[in-house]
Amino acid sequence: MLDNIRIVLVETSHTGNMGSVARAMKTMGLSKLYLVNPLVKPDSQAIALAAGASDVIGNATLVDSLDQALEGCNLVVGTSARSRTLPWPMLEPRECGVRSAQEAEHAPVALVFGRERVGLTNDELQKCHYHVAIPANPEYSSLNLAMAVQIIAYEVRIAHLDRLQAGQPEHEESPYPLVDDLERFYQHLEQTLLQTGFIRPAHQGQVMNKLRRLFTRARPEAQELNILRGILSSVQKTHDE
């Protein structure tokens, strides 16, 4: 199961953080590190701070975009503070661990961490099914990147061990669509709404953001998503006649 957990770092600017994250991952049994457009490439400092987890660094997958890192994933959780202009379904770290361990039994799960200074952008966060916030001391809530990864990775491991102890079934088929399929649905929905005049090109972003939030909250299963796409195709066909 742990092999299905991806730790995704977006535009990391310090190689030392890559090494410290690798160490945090390996102590919890995680090995899949994805680096999205890193501002620096892993170097000797990253290897030194990995402290025995250099294999995690050496096997890291470097990609140009977040979409590439999320390809094939069934669940995506992004780290975020709670104060956002567009509210999103939130998880506590323990809930994040439980849900990640459950869904990683049948498909890859991505846990996404943002830039050291500014975190994830709103556009990046909208690609996530859930956001997770670490309830740190409000008077001093500063966590470095490796600390945040360690906390979330620990919760995933504990949830995984609990599932093993309880004898939970492994490798069950997921009812939920992959991230790629959801993105195709959103593109289809946007095309249909533009075609029917429900939204206009100058103002499509605000409506689509709210619709993304709606479907993220509802989280339709794969068969339900196919029904929705069938409805959209029917609307487009009728509109063209």
From Swiss-Prot:
<keyword id="KW-0819">tRNA processing</keyword>
<dbReference type="GO" id="GO:0002128">
    <property type="term" value="P:tRNA nucleoside ribose methylation"/>
</dbReference>
<dbReference type="InterPro" id="IPR029028">
    <property type="entry name" value="Alpha/beta_knot_MTases"/>
</dbReference>
<protein>
    <recommendedName>
        <fullName>tRNA (cytidine/uridine-2'-O-)-methyltransferase TrmJ</fullName>
        <ecNumber>2.1.1.200</ecNumber>
    </recommendedName>
</protein>
<dbReference type="Pfam" id="PF00588">
    <property type="entry name" value="SpoU_methylase"/>
</dbReference>
<dbReference type="GO" id="GO:0003723">
    <property type="term" value="F:RNA binding"/>
</dbReference>
<feature type="binding site">
    <location>
        <position position="114"/>
    </location>
    <ligand>
        <name>S-adenosyl-L-methionine</name>
    </ligand>
</feature>
<dbReference type="InterPro" id="IPR029026">
    <property type="entry name" value="tRNA_m1G_MTases_N"/>
</dbReference>
<feature type="binding site">
    <location>
        <position position="134"/>
    </location>
    <ligand>
        <name>S-adenosyl-L-methionine</name>
    </ligand>
</feature>
<comment type="subunit">
    <text>Homodimer.</text>
</comment>
<dbReference type="InterPro" id="IPR004384">
    <property type="entry name" value="RNA_MeTrfase_TrmJ/LasT"/>
</dbReference>
<dbReference type="InterPro" id="IPR001537">
    <property type="entry name" value="SpoU_MeTrfase"/>
</dbReference>
<feature type="binding site">
    <location>
        <begin position="79"/>
        <end position="81"/>
    </location>
    <ligand>
        <name>S-adenosyl-L-methionine</name>
    </ligand>
</feature>
<dbReference type="GO" id="GO:0005829">
    <property type="term" value="C:cytosol"/>
</dbReference>
<keyword id="KW-0963">Cytoplasm</keyword>
<feature type="binding site">
    <location>
        <begin position="141"/>
        <end position="143"/>
    </location>
    <ligand>
        <name>S-adenosyl-L-methionine</name>
    </ligand>
</feature>
<keyword id="KW-0489">Methyltransferase</keyword>
<dbReference type="GO" id="GO:0160206">
    <property type="term" value="F:tRNA (cytidine(32)/uridine(32)-2'-O)-methyltransferase activity"/>
</dbReference>
<keyword id="KW-0949">S-adenosyl-L-methionine</keyword>
<comment type="similarity">
    <text>Belongs to the class IV-like SAM-binding methyltransferase superfamily. RNA methyltransferase TrmH family.</text>
</comment>
<comment type="function">
    <text>Catalyzes the formation of 2'O-methylated cytidine (Cm32) or 2'O-methylated uridine (Um32) at position 32 in tRNA.</text>
</comment>
<keyword id="KW-0808">Transferase</keyword>
